[in-house]
């Protein structure tokens, strides 16, 4: 279609196009090797699209109609893979129309050229180096056509997988068709003396072989020991979540073997403990640093046990830093089962890069806070909002009217203190809270009731209160904390889950959190954690429900906390907080998925054998024979 000298001058366009194809497959191969599984990054489709446009131009210039037609069709498929994950996803019908139009536009110039130039070849053999090659016979052309057809069919195979699964991937059949078709085309272009296509199809054999090798190695991994699942919770709050999750799993399959890390609640539900949760009780940067070798030994024990048992599902509940190491190690070692993380790390507060780790390694993320769904709205990671378990716990809580009589506490009005659950937190925060109470207007009219998580700390708590001049006081065991919240006039609580419990019990509350000097330094100057609010009620509502006093000893004083107590002594301030707590509850109970529905979503389709038959029928009516 073009003058011969121009055809030769523009011939390198095909070579440049193959550099883009080569780069696309090289990136795909390297990332697949790193992840130990066939993986397709977005860059693969972008680079392939650029290469396809250049190969279409190369086909026009060199009068190679099949080449232009093939890459025209492939260009539409590349576009579809990029489009399917976007917010402007086109329908399948629209995509098919684009494909037909592309093929027509590609064919039209060749048809016009053939009409005006009857001797034009539709598949010219360039023989760029002028080798003394005789024209290939019909059998060579059959080999070439068969190779090109098989090779080109791989992206149509991929397209079918894409539309069926709504997910961009390159299945094993894609690589098998690519290898067989590429090998036949490679032989054919050697015979015709076409260096661009020799390079293209010759180099194209390498990614196919590399990915088939990865797929073969993956298929040789041991099968799942089913039914079994691993659960890990390193904190008391995680133990509560894990016990509820474990109860639902056991209801669906009573014979499932559940093992891992858990506290007394999870062990009560049938967890076989590899390590007890109590062995993970560390808090703050300094305590974690001192326990790093012990944590490393536990980490090694756990990932080795998981790889040996090979459960189908791994549930990591909260405790993100430890679990992230475990999750990455499992994927690196080729673990193929589902990994679900229960409770999103506070990426909205600090270290937002952890979102990429979640997207890379997890199958599902279970959320307990309503605003977290918005964070992942454009993410490929599947998220399920279960709601916060405290909502249900507090709603079902039955008051014990005689709790004061049991503890020999008078009916005098009270202020409640919740200094924390760990020893370091308790004594740092209790001192600030006691001084604030003593400086407030309620000190003479109210008694001081302190919630204690562990009886072994009670003696030291009473000694500290006496030292601070708070003599009208009593210790209240943690199991009575909800009665305490509902009975007291106001509460001072250490920043944490206890603040959300207070809000759901509609308790007027002030948040305090006195940090160690070292933790304060790291938070301010190393990790630079500066957010509008730190307690969950304030974060969820986006407003200041509870006043917050958080930081080092120079960031706030007991007198400032006392001023906040005096505001809550006013009925107007108290009612304002209670109304805000009611709105918080409404926000937290919208669009919640039940645990049973959650497990159905996790174990959908290929994992149906995990569930009891009645559950299969309930959620998979077409598969009742499974």
Curated annotation (Swiss-Prot):
Gene Ontology molecular-function annotations: lipid-A-disaccharide synthase activity; phospholipid binding
Residue segments, region Unknown: 1-225
SMART domains linked to this entry: LAB_N (SM01259)
Pfam families in UniProt: LAB_N (PF07578), LpxB (PF02684)
Functional pathway: Bacterial outer membrane biogenesis; LPS lipid A biosynthesis
Enzyme class: transferase
Keyword presence, Lipid biosynthesis: yes
Statement: the UniProt record of this protein carries the keyword Lipid biosynthesis: yes
EC numbers on record: 2.4.1.182
Catalytic reactions on record: a lipid X + a UDP-2-N,3-O-bis[(3R)-3-hydroxyacyl]-alpha-D-glucosamine = a lipid A disaccharide + UDP + H(+)
UniProt record, GO biological process: lipid A biosynthetic process
GO cellular component: membrane
UniProt keywords, alphabetically: Glycosyltransferase, Lipid A biosynthesis, Lipid biosynthesis, Lipid metabolism, Transferase
Annotated region described as Lipid-A-disaccharide synthase, given as residue ranges: 226-626
Family classification: In the C-terminal section; belongs to the LpxB family.
PANTHER family tied to this protein: LIPID-A-DISACCHARIDE SYNTHASE (PTHR30372), LIPID-A-DISACCHARIDE SYNTHASE, MITOCHONDRIAL-RELATED (PTHR30372:SF4)
NCBIfam families, alphabetized: lpxB, PRK01021.1
HAMAP family with a match to the protein in the record: LpxB
Function description: Condensation of UDP-2,3-diacylglucosamine and 2,3-diacylglucosamine-1-phosphate to form lipid A disaccharide, a precursor of lipid A, a phosphorylated glycolipid that anchors the lipopolysaccharide to the outer membrane of the cell.
Name of this chain's protein: Lipid-A-disaccharide synthase
Organism: Chlamydia caviae (strain ATCC VR-813 / DSM 19441 / 03DC25 / GPIC)
């Amino acid at each position: 279609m073009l003058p011969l000298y121009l055809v030769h001058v523009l011939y390198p366009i095909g070579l440049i196009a193959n550099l883009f194809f080569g780069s696309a497959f090289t990136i795909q191969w390297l990332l697949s090797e790193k992840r130990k599984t066939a993986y397709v990054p977005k860059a693969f489709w972008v680079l392939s699209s650029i290469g396809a446009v250049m190969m279409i131009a190369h086909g026009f210039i060199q009068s190679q109609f099949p080449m232009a037609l093939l890459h025209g069709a492939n260009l539409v498929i590349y576009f579809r893979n990029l489009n399917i994950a976007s917010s402007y996803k086109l329908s399948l019908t629209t995509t098919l129309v684009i494909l037909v139009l592309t093929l027509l536009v590609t064919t039209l110039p060749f048809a016009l050229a053939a009409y005006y130039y009857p001797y034009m070849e539709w598949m010219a053999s360039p023989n760029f180096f002028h080798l003394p090659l005789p024209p290939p016979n019909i059998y060579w052309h059959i080999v070439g056509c068969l190779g090109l057809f098989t090779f080109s069919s791989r992206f149509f195979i991929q397209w079918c997988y894409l539309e069926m699964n709504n997910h961009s991937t390159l299945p094993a059949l894609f690589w098998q068709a690519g290898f067989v078709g590429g090998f036949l085309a490679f032989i054919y272009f050697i015979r015709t003396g076409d260096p661009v296509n020799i390079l293209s199809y010759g180099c194209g054999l390498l990614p196919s072989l590399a990915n088939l090798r990865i797929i073969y190695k993956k298929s040789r991994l041991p099968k799942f020991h089913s039914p079994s699942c691993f659960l890990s919770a390193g904190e008391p709050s995680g133990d509560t979540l894990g016990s509820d999750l474990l109860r639902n799993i056991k209801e669906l399959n009573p014979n499932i073997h559940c093992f891992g890390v858990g506290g007394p609640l999870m062990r009560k539900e049938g967890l076989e403990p590899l390590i007890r949760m109590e062995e993970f009780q560390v808090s703050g940067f300094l305590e974690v640093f001192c326990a790093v070798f012990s944590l490393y030994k536990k980490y090694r024990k756990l990932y080795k046990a998981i790889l040996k048992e090979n459960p189908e599902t791994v549930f990591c509940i909260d405790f993100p830093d430890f679990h992230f190491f475990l999750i990455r190690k499992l994927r690196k070692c080729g673990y193929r089962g589902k990994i679900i993380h229960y409770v999103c790390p506070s990426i909205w507060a600090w270290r937002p890069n952890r979102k990429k780790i979640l997207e890379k390694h997890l199958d599902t993320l279970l959320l307990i806070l309503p605003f977290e769904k918005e964070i992942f709205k454009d993410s490929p990671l599947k998220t399920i909002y279960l709601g916060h378990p405290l909502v249900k716990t507090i709603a079902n809580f039955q008051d014990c009217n005689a709790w004061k009589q049991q503890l020999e506490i008078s009916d005098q009005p009270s202020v409640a203190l919740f200094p924390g659950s760990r020893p370091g937190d308790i004594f740092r925060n209790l001192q600030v809270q006691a001084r604030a109470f003593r400086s407030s207007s309620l000190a003479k009219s109210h008694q001081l009731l302190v919630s204690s998580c562990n009886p072994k700390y009670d003696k030291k708590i009473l000694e500290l209160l006496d030292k601070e001049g708070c003599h009208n006081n009593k210790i209240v065991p943690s199991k009575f904390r909800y009665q305490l919240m509902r009975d007291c006039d106001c509460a001072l609580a250490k920043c944490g889950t206890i603040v959300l419990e207070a809000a759901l019990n509609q308790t007027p509350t002030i948040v305090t959190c006195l940090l160690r000097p070292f933790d304060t330094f790291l938070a301010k100057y190393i990790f630079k954690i500066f957010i509008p609010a730190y307690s969950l009620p304030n974060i969820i509502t986006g407003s200041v429900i509870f006043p917050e006093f958080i930081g080092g000893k120079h960031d706030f004083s007991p007198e400032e906390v006392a001023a906040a107590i005096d505001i809550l002594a006013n009925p107007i301030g108290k009612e304002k907080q209670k109304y805000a707590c009611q709105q918080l509850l409404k926000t937290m109970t919208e669009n919640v998925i039940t645990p049973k529905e959650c497990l159905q979503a996790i174990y959908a389709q290929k994992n149906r054998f995990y569930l009891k038959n009645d559950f299969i029928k309930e959620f998979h009516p077409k598969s009742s024979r499974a």
